[in-house]
């Protein structure tokens, strides 16, 4: 094998590894975005129910607290994007 073939094979392997890393990061960010949307939706729903009935819905509050406990990040901080 010539040196050019070896360099080409190494370049393909490096490109494959980089592609896997990039798509993994994209997937993690996508999941985080979906979780944030669900949390925002639950917060809006709790606010609407609180306005309608004068108190918060216990089921929604429990679901929101469960979601927040799953991820230790501060979801309301949008400055890091």
From Swiss-Prot:
GO terms for cellular component: host cell membrane; membrane. The keyword Ion transport applies. Phosphorylated by host CK2. This phosphorylation is necessary for interaction with human BTRC and degradation of CD4. Ion channel activity is inhibited by hexamethylene amiloride in vitro. It is found in: Host membrane. Residues 29-81 are cytoplasmic. Pfam families: Vpu. GO terms for biological process: receptor catabolic process; symbiont-mediated suppression of host innate immune response; symbiont-mediated suppression of host type I interferon-mediated signaling pathway; symbiont-mediated-mediated suppression of host tetherin activity; viral release from host cell. Residues 50-81 are annotated as: Disordered. Belongs to the HIV-1 VPU protein family. This is Protein Vpu. It comes from Human immunodeficiency virus type 1 (HIV-1).
């Amino acid at each position: 094998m010539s040196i050019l073939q070896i360099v080409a094979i190494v370049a393909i392997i490096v490109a494959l590894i980089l592609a896997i890393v990039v798509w993994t990061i994209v997937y993690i960010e996508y999941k985080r975005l979906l979780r944030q949307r669900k949390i925002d939706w639950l917060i809006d729903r709790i606010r609407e129910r609180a306005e309608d009935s004068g108190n918060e819905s216990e089921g929604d509050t429990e679901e929101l607290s469960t979601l927040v406990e799953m991820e230790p990040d501060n979801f309301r901080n949008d400055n890091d994007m």
